[in-house]
Amino acid sequence: MTDSQQSKPKHVMMMAAGTGGHVFPALAVAKQLQQQGCQVSWLATPTGMENRLLKDQNIPIYQIDIQGVRGNGVIRKLAAPFKILKATFSAMRYMKQLKVDAVAGFGGYVAGPGGLAARLLGIPVLIHEQNAVAGFTNAQLSRVAKVVCEAFPNTFPASEKVVTTGNPVRREITDILSPKWRYDEREQADKPLNILIVGGSLGAKALNERLPPALKQLEVPLNIFHQCGQQQVEATQALYADAPANLTIQVLPFIEDMAKAYSEADLIICRAGALTVTEVATAGVAAVFVPLPIAVDDHQTANAKFLADIGAAKICQQSTMTPEVLNQLFTTLMNRQLLTEMAVKARQHAQPNATQHVVDLIQKM
């Protein structure tokens, strides 16, 4: 390696598009790479949410025109090879122009052509899969990638290039105090159990409609914090209207400080997206996961099993959420010692150093 090559900062192109589940972990890694002196650029789609999320992040964006083909109509599928080829050439042009040294793909439509472009140019590729079941793009790229990162064990067949890193999470989540300390403090203060229900930014209608009737049947003192989405506040409040006196209820459109919410919760009831499961484990909170039934390849159930299989969480499929089933489940869980044990197990299986682990792997390529 020449002196000029040694003095040139490593240029890493990030590839992530479409959803926050892809973009947020990639952004955490990108910011850490920048802090270590790397030059970072981002391969994006023209209309994806990544453009909005990266607006003030001081990361230059380069767009290629690509859309998903899985499950779409015949005409789009026939046109797909030509669109992929065009997008691949566009990505190759950017990579040569920018003198990219390494490429890191985190999923989304953009990662396919980008990974292929890097492969054709001889640029090393790292991919990161956030879910317990690999997405279509990452499953294909795993064949040509130099390093394959998985958030959950056994997502990919065992290989020297496969590394279980966990999912990168925000610093405020990794800084939450230990679950044993938090739960013991609340027990010593003889506080009611805190139940946190998180339906996401749009609100999970099934959680909003089915949980209040079941929770109202419980006889123990509870503080319920129910995040239901902006459009479902009034309807959710109405379902709690005749709640008994042992329940203290707050219905919220959204929660700005999730780290605080995690730290104060004894039990969380939520979907099982990859980042949600990762944050629950990192925070150390007992959980009931209700996987999204329409998730591709039922990956949310696979995500939830990561914690359920070690006794840190329960899985309740949406199709089984009857008042009787929920009442039986919640009655079992209204035990602070059990919840403490679940929370401790969750934290024990977290990987809070995932961001730095992925960064180190990129730096070594």
UniProtKB/Swiss-Prot annotation:
Gene3D superfamilies recorded: Glycogen Phosphorylase B
Q: Name the EC number(s).
A: 2.4.1.227
The alphabetical list of record keywords is:
Cell cycle, Cell division, Cell inner membrane, Cell membrane, Cell shape, Cell wall biogenesis/degradation, Glycosyltransferase, Membrane, Peptidoglycan synthesis, Transferase
Would the keyword Signal be found if you checked this record's keyword annotation?
no
Q: Which residues bind UDP-N-acetyl-alpha-D-glucosamine?
A: 19-21, 131, 170, 201, 255, 274-279, 300
For the keyword Metal-binding, the answer is no
InterPro entries per record: GlcNAc_MurG, Glyco_trans_28_C, GlycoTrans_28_N
Which Pfam families does the record associate with it?
Glyco_tran_28_C, Glyco_transf_28
Membrane topology according to the record: Peripheral membrane protein
Its Gene Ontology molecular function terms? UDP-N-acetyl-D-glucosamine:N-acetylmuramoyl-L-alanyl-D-glutamyl-meso-2,6-diaminopimelyl-D-alanyl-D-alanine-diphosphoundecaprenol 4-beta-N-acetylglucosaminlytransferase activity; undecaprenyldiphospho-muramoylpentapeptide beta-N-acetylglucosaminyltransferase activity
CC terms in the record's Gene Ontology section: plasma membrane
Pathway named in the protein's UniProt entry? Cell wall biogenesis; peptidoglycan biosynthesis
Name the source's superkingdom. Bacteria
Major location, coarse class? Answer: membrane
Please list the coiled coil stretches: none
For this chain, the family text in UniProt reads:
Belongs to the glycosyltransferase 28 family. MurG subfamily.
The record's listing under PANTHER family reads: GLYCOSYLTRANSFERASE, UDP-N-ACETYLGLUCOSAMINE--N-ACETYLMURAMYL-(PENTAPEPTIDE) PYROPHOSPHORYL-UNDECAPRENOL N-ACETYLGLUCOSAMINE TRANSFERASE 1
Protein's name according to its UniProt entry: UDP-N-acetylglucosamine--N-acetylmuramyl-(pentapeptide) pyrophosphoryl-undecaprenol N-acetylglucosamine transferase
Biological classification of the source: Bacteria, Pseudomonadati, Pseudomonadota, Gammaproteobacteria, Moraxellales
